[in-house]
Amino acid sequence: MTHVLDAAQTALRLPYPALAAEMAALLSDPTVQVPPRLVQALPGGGSLFVMPALDARIAITKLITFTPANAGTGRATIQGDVVVFDVATGGRRLLLDGPTVTARRTAAVSLLAAQRLAPNPDGPLLIVGAGAQGLAHLEAFAQGLGITEMVVASRSQASAEALAQKARTLGLQARATTDANAALADCPLAVTCTPASEVVLRALPREDGFVAAVGAFTPTMVELAPRLCRHFAELGRVFVDTPDAAHEAGDLLQAGLDVSAFASLGDVVRGSAAAGQGPVLFKSCGWAGWDLAAARVAVR
């Protein structure tokens, strides 16, 4: 029997600390297989993503569309589902809400990276982008790092204030701004989670800064200024979520950096890489393995 979960039910199955812990476990699981994802361009500028992954117990496929033109229209930019199958029987076990899985697993990856790499994990936290990913990162860092103070930056003051108000209802101190670059000086933690249609962060980080950039996942997308990326590479450390970032990380590729030279989150978890001195940039592009980790948590 297939259990079909809506967005709220999917969210309840995926607490952020458990997700981050499962991702760390997955990175050391030799049974995990993640074939290359299929990204098919759609008329009008959207994309169709087909993202399979499996381990010894379950197999999943995330089937979603990304429609950037929906931003600001009231329609979701990400729509679709995650189907979870039992490897032994071939039966379908779960149907999860795709946008909810995507938002929560992306934020949990950033959380895991911050737990392992952030020089100053106490905050305040700057969130650049006030959409679904902004909310997910707010919740993840509050639950997983105990952040109590944050700044929300968006081109729209109203959008920034709405997310800041949501943070206040969760007991956090929060303020809204339209100037992310000015706010960065006060925040050792930062996440950029925008549609990645233009540079949103140019200011250089603090010496104890950690920036997770999650919005850009193709070579043509960008959130961070090239000079900022090169600053991290020269005076700090750059990490990527997976080696696939070598052909997906638009921020780093447009900065002229050799992305294949950067350590991955798996290297960090397995102990072959560490942050060291200086500011840290974590570039996340997405991977079906993260969706598999979410499915592993959801089926428990």
Residue map of PLM features:
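N-terminal ligand-binding/catalytic initiation module
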Residues: M1-A103, L111, A118-P121, A288-L292, ...
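NAD(P)-binding Rossmann-fold cofactor-contacting core
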Residues: G144-L170
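Glycine-rich Rossmann-fold phosphate-binding loop(s) that bind the pyrophosphate
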Residues: A130-G131
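Short helix-loop-beta connector
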Residues: L117-P124, G146, E207
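C-terminal helix-to-coil terminal segments
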Residues: A274-R300
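Rossmann-fold NAD(P) dinucleotide-binding segment
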Residues: N181-A182, D186-L189, A196-F210, E223-P226
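Rossmann-fold NAD(P)-binding glycine/threonine-rich loop
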Residues: V214-G271
